Regions:
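Generic beta-strand/beta-sheet core signal
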Residues: 87, 133, 171, 179-181, ...
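Gly/Thr-rich phosphate-binding beta-strand-loop-beta motif of the actin/hexokinase/Hsp70
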Residues: 362-389
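C-terminal nuclease/phosphodiesterase catalytic domains that cleave nucleic-acid phosphodiester bonds
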Residues: 47, 206, 333-337, 451-558
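Conserved luminal/periplasmic juxtamembrane motif of membrane-embedded glycan-processing enzymes
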Residues: 200, 279, 345, 353, ...
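A glycine-rich phosphate-binding loop feature that marks nucleotide/adenosyl-phosphate handling sites
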Residues: 164-166, 229-235, 266, 434-439, ...
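Phosphate/NTP-binding elements of NTP-utilizing enzymes
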Residues: 1-372, 425, 502
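Mg2+-dependent endonuclease catalytic cores in nucleic-acid-processing enzymes, primarily RNase H-like
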Residues: 5, 11-27, 238-250, 258-259, ...
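Short acidic-glycine loop/turn motifs at beta-strand connectors
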Residues: 170-172, 387-391, 484-485
Length: 558
């Protein structure tokens, strides 16, 4: 897939469906079976409800673009994606789309045949076996109740369809079956397409985890990519460990370089991070400010609904403003936003709101401060720069020990620090000492004279967090305030984002101050790049207010 020449996308757009090229054209794969699949849907399926009930089924443009990626293939006809997640707000039309896809998988041209005149051509799949899996009968009922209305007379007659409450048969021997809360019913089966319905409710307590594991195993066992699985969900509730949350975490891990992409399509459309909800009540006495905030909420809902124009924006806004509905649930259901867990430090939407799409890249000679946090084998090691001019954060390098035989390559880390000092005008550096003390001492000796600001009286770059807990807690507080006030910016680096949102608050012995840490000591959700960002930003703040800052304009943040 050619990803060159793409426009940058804001954080609320995840996946390829809403991406565009610099030419203004939609970003689409070179080869896809979607054209044949959608033409088949138009010929054989009918709209199940609404003003167009009974007319030929036509997906929205947004749904069509999603289908182009789900059915994208390479030159040899192999699907680009083995599994996927489609996350949209409540009422977007996920069930009708999945019902249409299930019927197409049963009898339509969903298997690659050949390339003709530069276009991939599809053919019906032999022995089609579709499973609609859920953790409750109500969930599968949502999909199966659509089949009688969607299957046209032509479809029933030409393909010999028999539609029952939880089973659909075709004359060719294909079947669509409902599977609920029964991992044993899935074990060892060889389906060709599996729908995981409403995975935000798939929990360990209702066998959701086990079912997802069995489905994943069936997909892995299928020869030549003959089986694929697609999850549909609303935004999940963080901390519940639902399958939807696990899928989201897997996507973030891939983006951050913590995991290998094995063919996962994750597609979501959220309201922008700065869409106000709880803020509206505080503005009630200021009519002008309230109206402006209400317009931003309206715009956020319009963005999140995508092409689902049947969703009434006024009705959704009324539900959001109903004080009986928790703000977190309104954001989850109607804005499709993933909220923060209760003890999290910075919410994803708070961090995303600080991303600047037109941010000037870090360039040679830029005046910066550096933050460093090192580890030998258990945690990551990272080096982050904060540009003095505009408080922009950049991850210079990050090392995952698992990618280096279980141990961070120290000489590589040293070379990166040397390169940073050679490339940029480094005015201050804060480096945690633990597990990298010898190198921190070396950097202090080698570069100390160049620094405008000294981190420690004995070593200009040394910042031992074991002995400076209060200083670090103050820096954490200042960093959080800057994020909330959007006076710190970043380029959307996926590693830094993941580490920022992984960090949780930890109490200290200093009045109301808190520090940050991992969720648990052995948690795999790392925060090292976040620590570096705090150190770099703290050094920047100290520098711009010091007497050492002379002669060059900067934005002073308070």
């Amino acid at each position: 897939v050619d990803e060159s020449g793409l426009l940058p996308v804001p954080p609320h757009v995840i996946g390829p469906t809403w991406r565009k090229r610099t030419s203004g054209e939609w970003y689409l794969p070179e080869y896809t079976l979607a054209d044949d699949v959608v033409n088949w849907m138009f010929a054989y399926l009918t709209q199940p409800s609404g003003p167009r009930a009974g007319e030929p089924f036509i997906p929205t443009f947004e749904q069509f673009r999603f289908l182009t990626w789900w059915y994208a293939v390479d030159e040899s006809g192999r699907f680009l994606y083995r599994n996927g997640t489609l996350r949209r707000l409540k009422g977007w039309g996920k069930d009708p789309l999945l019902a249409a896809m299930s019927l197409a998988e049963l009898s339509g041209p969903v298997a690659f045949s050949h390339v003709e005149k530069g276009k991939a051509v599809g053919t019906p799949r032999a022995s089609a076996w579709i499973q609609v899996a859920a953790v409750s009968q109500d969930q599968t009922r949502n999909t199966f109740s659509l089949f009688p209305a969607m299957a046209s007379r032509r479809l029933r007659e030409e393909y010999g369809l028999e539609i029952h409450r939880t089973l659909v048969y075709s004359e060719a021997g294909g079947v669509i079956e409902a599977v609920t809360s029964s991992p044993l019913a899935l074990e060892g089966k060889r389906p060709t397409f599996v729908v995981l319905n409403e995975t935000q409710w798939w929990l360990e307590s209702n066998a959701g985890h086990e079912m997802a594991g069995v489905i994943s195993g069936n997909v892995d066992k299928a020869a030549y990519g003959a089986c694929r699985s697609l999850s549909i969900c609303n935004a999940h509730r963080p901390g519940e460990e639902s399958v939807a949350e696990r899928d989201y975490e897997a996507y973030l891990a891939i983006q951050a370089g913590e995991a290998v992409d094995n063919g996962m399509l994750y597609d979501s459309l959220e309201a922008p991070a700065d869409t106000p909800v709880s803020e509206l009540a505080a503005l009630a006495e200021d009519p002008e400010a309230y109206a402006e905030a209400l317009n931003r909420l309206r715009r956020g809902v319009e963005i999140a609904r995508g092409d689902a124009e049947w969703l009434d924006v006024d009705t959704i806004i009324s539900s959001i403003l109903d004080i009986r509905n928790p703000v977190t649930e309104s954001r989850r259901k109607f804005l499709n936003q993933v909220n923060a867990v209760e003890d999290s430090w910075i919410a994803p939407r708070e961090w995303d709101a600080c991303r600047e799409l037109s941010l000037r890249p870090l360039e040679k000679g830029d005046r910066v401060t550096l933050g460093f946090d090192g580890s030998k084998s258990n945690d990551w090691t990272a080096l982050v720069a904060c540009r003095v001019e505009d408080s922009a954060l950049f991850v210079l390098r990050a090392w995952n020990p698992e990618r280096h035989g279980g141990e961070v390559p120290r000489e590589d880390v040293h070379a990166a620090v040397v390169s940073a000092f050679a490339t940029y005008d480094v005015v201050a550096m804060r480096a945690d000492v633990k597990e990298f003390e010898a190198y921190v001492d070396l950097w202090g000796e080698r570069f100390g004279r160049k620094l405008k600001l000294k981190s420690d009286a004995k070593n200009p770059v040394r910042f031992d967090m074991r002995g400076r807990k209060k200083d670090f807690a103050l820096a954490v507080e200042a960093f959080y305030d800057a994020v909330v006030e959007r006076t710190v910016v970043h380029d959307g680096n996926p590693i830094l984002r993941r580490h920022i949102v992984n960090a949780v608050r930890r109490p200290t012995n200093y009045e109301d101050l808190y520090t940050i840490g991992k969720a648990t000591k052995d948690s795999k959700r790392k925060i090292d790049a976040a620590v570096c960002a705090v150190l770099a930003f703290g050094a920047r703040q100290e520098f711009v207010t010091s007497k050492k800052n002379r002669g060059r304009g900067v934005v002073i943040l308070k």
